[in-house]
């Protein structure tokens, strides 16, 4: 019997039992209680710091927290892939169920693929709940206020710096920040800096070690629902994400369905979340991704405009997994090579200082380079750009190397690109310009769009 069937048969039900909320400004703490009968129970804990000292409608706050718990539960449910999820914590409108089923099916596609779970089984997951009518609450939200999720990478830096030009009050938050994320948070032009602590139940980690099912969950969806809580608390009309056009690009096809590591960053998710949050939670909220029209290579181009961040940002996730105290680039993972490749055309040899060496010379990265460039090879499960823009980044890197290097011999990976994927100067120039000076579809309010277009033209 397949592994997932063994767990599903032994643990047919997962329960979202309840939640608790403790509001004592300047802190808000809440806990989610989950169980897998008969053997396991879990408590997931959150604490939001730096809250304003004011009163809140507890019913609204509880509803927002409860909905966050629906996303958080996926971290625990994935251990057994129980075929029934029972929601005891609060009533749900039957129209909400469609959203959460979509979140499970598409947001956890990578998990299904990695655990070889047939998608027909994923579609059969049942959500049992108490039905209740629901509509969004109308609350005071100011159009000058915006909530920004802040990571340690280039996207949130570009996001905040561009929105600064729009004279917005920016409320930036970071979840369980590491050293470089705190440094970024404290350097950004933010009106308010918010720290959120999250504590995963240690029992889940024990299940992972014991060989229970594990895999990717839609983390950006968790940030989206956290943002709703903060939007209510800080009276912000806008939630501005740093999700880009490249996030729509899938990694591979599994049983006839495209699997996208970044689905909860995709435009599809953004639109679903926009409609869901305005229909069922906060009537006048406006979540959108300010970087949606841009490819990753365009964001790299904009990031080059902000030198004070060049040596403090960190997009590599590997150090955090191995030793959280080590804050540096591993220089071996897909994120490191990708970031290096898209920044070199705009920063040149400064990238060598950022990474500590020239990654184009590392022969051991050839396999990664192939997965980036070869259309026949699946793209790694990471937050990366499209193969087309990585191709153009390699071309622009080759061009810059030839322009500024006294050593005309191309480094190993650039030479590999030239010998295997180079399409000729004219075609490469045409392709790269098309990528660098285009804007894709978005849900950006029109008053913000001009700031994006203007900044892109500064380095044309």
Tell me the role of every PLM-derived stretch.
Residues 2-32, 283, 290, 304-460:
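ATP/NTP-dependent adenylation/nucleotidyl-transfer catalytic domains that generate, transfer
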Residues 157-161, 221-229, 301, 335-342:
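Contiguous, well-ordered alpha-helical segments that form the cores/surfaces of helical PPI scaffolds
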Residues 53, 173-311, 315:
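ATP-dependent adenylate-handling ligase core
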């Amino acid at each position: 019997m397949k592994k997932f069937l063994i767990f599903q048969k032994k643990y047919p039900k997962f329960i979202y039992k309840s939640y608790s909320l403790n509001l004592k400004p300047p802190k808000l703490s809440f806990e989610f209680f989950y169980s897998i009968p008969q053997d396991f129970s879990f408590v997931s804990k959150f604490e939001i710091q730096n809250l304003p000292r004011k009163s809140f409608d507890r019913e609204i706050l509880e509803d927002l927290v409860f909905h966050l718990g629906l996303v958080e539960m996926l971290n625990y449910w994935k251990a057994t892939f129980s075929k029934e999820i029972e929601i005891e914590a609060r009533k749900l409108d039957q129209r909400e169920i469609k959203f959460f089923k979509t979140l499970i099916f598409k947001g956890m596609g990578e998990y299904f693929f990695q655990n070889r779970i047939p998608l027909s089984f994923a579609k059969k997951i049942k959500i049992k709940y108490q039905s209740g009518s629901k509509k969004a609450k109308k609350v005071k939200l100011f159009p000058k206020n915006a909530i920004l999720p802040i990571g340690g990478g280039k996207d949130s830096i570009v996001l905040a710096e561009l929105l600064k030009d729009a004279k917005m009050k920016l409320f930036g938050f970071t979840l369980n920040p590491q050293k470089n994320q705190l440094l970024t948070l404290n350097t950004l032009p933010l009106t308010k800096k918010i720290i959120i602590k999250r504590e995963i139940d240690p029992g889940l980690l024990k299940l992972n070690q014991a060989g229970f099912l594990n895999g990717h969950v839609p983390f950006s969806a968790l940030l989206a629902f956290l943002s709703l809580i903060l939007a209510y608390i800080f009276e912000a009309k806008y939630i501005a994400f740093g999700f880009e056009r490249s996030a729509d690009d899938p990694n591979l096809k599994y049983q006839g369905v495209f699997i996208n590591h970044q689905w909860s960053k995709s435009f599809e998710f953004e639109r679903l979340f926009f409609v869901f949050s305005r229909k069922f939670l906060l009537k006048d909220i406006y979540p959108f991704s300010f970087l949606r029209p841009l490819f990753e290579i365009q964001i790299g181009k904009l990031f080059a405009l902000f030198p004070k961040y060049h040596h403090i940002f960190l997009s590599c996730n590997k150090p955090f997994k191995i030793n959280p105290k080590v804050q540096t680039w591993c220089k071996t993972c897909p994120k490191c090579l990708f970031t290096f490749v898209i920044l070199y055309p705009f920063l040149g040899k400064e990238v060598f200082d950022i990474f500590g060496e020239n990654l184009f010379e590392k022969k051991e990265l050839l396999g990664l380079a192939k997965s980036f460039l070869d259309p026949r090879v699946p793209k790694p499960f990471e937050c990366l750009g499209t193969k087309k823009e990585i191709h153009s980044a390699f071309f622009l890197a080759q061009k810059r190397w030839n322009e500024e290097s006294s050593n005309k011999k191309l480094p190993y990976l650039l030479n590999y690109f030239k010998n295997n994927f180079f399409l000729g100067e004219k075609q490469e120039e045409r392709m790269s310009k098309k990528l660098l000076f285009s804007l894709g579809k978005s849900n950006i309010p029109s008053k913000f769009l001009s700031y994006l277009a203007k900044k892109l033209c500064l380095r044309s």
